[in-house]
Amino acid sequence: MYQEISKLLMYGDLPQDEILYKLGQLFEQFEVGEYNKTELVRDINTQVKRILNVATDYGFDDNLWHNYLTFFLMMSENPFSITCEKVGASDGSVNGLVANDFRIFKKLFDYDFKPIESALGIDCFTQISNYKAIVKKDLMYNHNVSEKVRALSKKLEAAKDEQEFFDVVTGFYKAYGVGMFGLNKAFRIEEHLDGGFSFMPINNMDAVMLDDLIGYEIQKKKLTDNTEAFVQGKKANNVLLFGDSGTGKSTSIKAIVNQYYDDGLRMIEIYKHQFKYLSKIIAAIKNRNYRFIIYMDDLSFEEHEIEYKFLKAVIEGGVETKPDNILIYATSNRRHLIKETWNDRNDQDNSNDKHHSDTVEEKLSLVNRFGVTISYSKPSQKEFFNIVTELARKSGCTLSDEELCREANKWELSHGGISGRTATQFVNYIMANN
């Protein structure tokens, strides 16, 4: 195994803590006969346990060795895989260089572990090659990643030779992409102590769809039309969803990402204090073969906050043109995003800012930088009752409409008033207690 792994070229830049790298070293010890049996068994078990940990995190099943190798190939970002993400496996010299890598991975897929298991008196590789995982709820792992890894793994198992193996992997790159952006729908920003950041996949995003949001048909269509144009490569606008709390603004964004994920749409959630990274975030994703929504939830600015300047600079663009594959979608309870105080209306009270009127105008004009603004208002009582009854029927509730509306009316009076969120909470309560 070690000799094969050491010949990898495009996929050979393995971190020293990578499972494949560690196993290669351990198998080299076994092959040359320089090992302590107890220590070697312990070290092999450590790496097998790591494979089990990955399998648990991502919901792998059946042949975990194949699942792990498949996951490794899917996550390997290199010049070849990123090019395939954009244009597929085009003819060129690089194909010849990569062909040997895929020949090696085909051998690793077909690797016979019996000699080492027999010599060391272990069966861990046999066990993980025919593994039956405990059934888990989807929210305990990334169901989307699990499905893709297991499906691709089955195709690679069936590959007759390295050419078919090559075709299957490169076909996946072209269809879905490579690395974390290829496998995941949504990300958040994780800040580092050194001032840098990284993208962290959101593994348990709600699997909500637009049809799950009752009502708001005009708003949903407006959002869908803009997003559909965006994923089709047409001109589209930044979007601001504003209005009352609990009316479905954030739900609409999540549903849009779920709906257009297969069309290459990805979402990056960013908080206000992270706006300083906006330029670097854009630089990191602008050349990838995806459409990115930079998502800002519950966006608003107080009088003393200046983070809006970072956002405004990105939206307006400076010397560098904003990439066509990036849009900003934001939700807010404030129509103008920024709280306007009485002092904002009175220049005389702001002697420290000789151009205070310009400052106020700069703040309030931020909303105009969003080409599409969509209003989400609280539903009327009739609309509220309609939301309640539809949600109840979808949940299998057997109470009559009259009973539901009567109890919903009592509920909303003590739970924040009429809204889609209140309706959902009420139905959850009813289903839990009936």
Predicted regions and their residues:
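Intrinsically disordered, low-complexity N-terminal extensions of AAA+/P-loop NTPases
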Residues: 1-157
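Interdomain "pre-motor" coupling segment immediately N-terminal to P-loop NTPase/helicase cores
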Residues: 133-199
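N-terminal pre-Walker A segment at the start of P-loop NTPase domains
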Residues: 200-228
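Walker A/P-loop nucleotide-binding motif
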Residues: 234-253
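AAA+/P-loop NTPase substrate/partner-engagement loops
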Residues: 259-292, 299-304
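Conserved catalytic/switch belt of AAA+ P-loop NTPases
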Residues: 302-352
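Conserved AAA+ ATPase "SRH/arginine-finger" region at the nucleotide-binding site
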Residues: 349-364, 371-385
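C-terminal alpha-helical "lid" subdomain
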Residues: 373, 377-434
